[in-house]
């Protein structure tokens, strides 16, 4: 947003403190559960008359990596408390008080990607974040890992994501 032009035209620009955080956070958790437990796959099979006992995997005591520990990322940390996740976070701004209270460990993005069972992205789309989840980064993830992006789609290189799924470099997204 061109703030100078907006100011000259008398247009007020503001950033709201309230976000749709509860809806986004619940969606993030639901997507984690859906992929890990293969809920959609099983539902589709049953509708097609196929009965496969696919248990999927539990989320309990996995490592959750959160890219972007702002309002939504912090809300996710609070929501998943009962899963006993080990929580890693990558963010340019560290809230040490929150991290200590909620047992969040800040780390660099490469450490987060290589150690996390689930990676959940909560970033604004900027010139710096556009395409940040490229082939190199996606291929650092564990083959059984899950990628959740409830931010903007352009943060992930879609061709690279497709390749990582097709080549089974990650479990699901």
Predicted regions and their residues:
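Conserved S-adenosyl-L-methionine
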Residues: 82-86, 171
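Rossmann-like adenosine-cofactor binding region
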Residues: 93-173
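Gly/Ala-rich phosphate-binding loop of Rossmann-like dinucleotide-binding domains
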Residues: 77, 81, 165-166
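Phosphate/diphosphate ligand-binding glycine-rich loop within oxidoreductases
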Residues: 1-43, 147
């Amino acid at each position: 947003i061109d703030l100078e032009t907006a100011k000259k035209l008398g247009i007020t620009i503001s950033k709201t403190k309230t976000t749709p955080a509860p809806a986004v956070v619940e969606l993030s958790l639901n997507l984690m559960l859906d992929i890990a437990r293969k809920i959609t796959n099983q539902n589709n099979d049953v509708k097609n008359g196929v009965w496969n006992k696919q248990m999927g995997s539990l989320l309990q005591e996995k490592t959750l990596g959160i890219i972007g520990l702002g309002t939504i990322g912090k809300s996710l940390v609070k929501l998943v408390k009962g899963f006993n996740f080990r929580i890693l976070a990558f963010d340019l701004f560290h809230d040490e008080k929150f991290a200590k209270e909620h047992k969040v460990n800040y780390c660099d993005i490469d450490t987060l990607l290589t150690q996390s069972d689930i990676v959940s992205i909560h970033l604004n789309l900027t010139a710096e974040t556009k395409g940040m989840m490229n082939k190199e980064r996606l291929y650092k993830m564990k083959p059984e890992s899950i990628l959740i992006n409830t931010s903007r789609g352009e943060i992930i290189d879609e061709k690279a994501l497709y390749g990582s799924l097709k080549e089974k470099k990650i479990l699901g997204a």
